[in-house]
Swiss-Prot record:
One of its GO terms (cellular component) is high-density lipoprotein particle. The modification Pyrrolidone carboxylic acid is found at residue 19. It is found in: Secreted. Major acute phase reactant. Belongs to the SAA family. Residues 100-122 are annotated as: Disordered. Apolipoprotein of the HDL complex. This is Serum amyloid A-2 protein. GO terms for biological process: acute-phase response. The keyword Oxidoreductase does not apply. It comes from Mesocricetus auratus (Golden hamster).
Length: 122
């Protein structure tokens, strides 16, 4: 049901024509994988004050895929921040995370948020 709703959403709201919606969905899937990779890297690194960097990097990588990737990054980021707010996390931290998310999606360098000493692997 969810994939069907996504396709309808693409047609009606985003105005994706019939020849581009496959490309859009492919980009969205790739963007979702980029966001997941940034999340798993953040968990693996377990580095203090690195979450903004990984937020920006995941959104940047996803948005580089195209409109579908940028859409997936926005949906995932907004859902993640909404979930954090429901759990009682501070609004200031959420605003800072959203700033990093938008920074990455806009194509700006995510290394702006890179904490000192973070291994070059990331």
């Amino acid at each position: 049901m969810k994939p069907f709703l996504s396709i309808i959403f693409c047609f009606l709201v985003l105005g994706v024509d019939s020849q581009r919606w496959f490309q859009f969905m492919k980009e969205a899937g790739q963007g979702t994988r980029d966001m997941w990779r940034a999340y798993t890297d953040m968990r693996e690194a377990n580095w203090k004050n690195s979450d903004k960097y990984f937020h920006a990097r995941g959104n940047y990588d996803a948005a580089q895929r195209g409109p579908g990737g940028a859409w997936a990054a926005k949906v995932i980021s907004d859902a993640r921040e909404g979930f954090k707010r429901m759990r009682g996390r501070g609004i200031e931290d959420s605003r800072a995370d959203q700033f990093a998310n938008e920074w990455g999606r806009s194509g700006k360098d995510p290394n702006f948020f890179r904490p000192p000493g973070l291994p070059s692997k990331y």
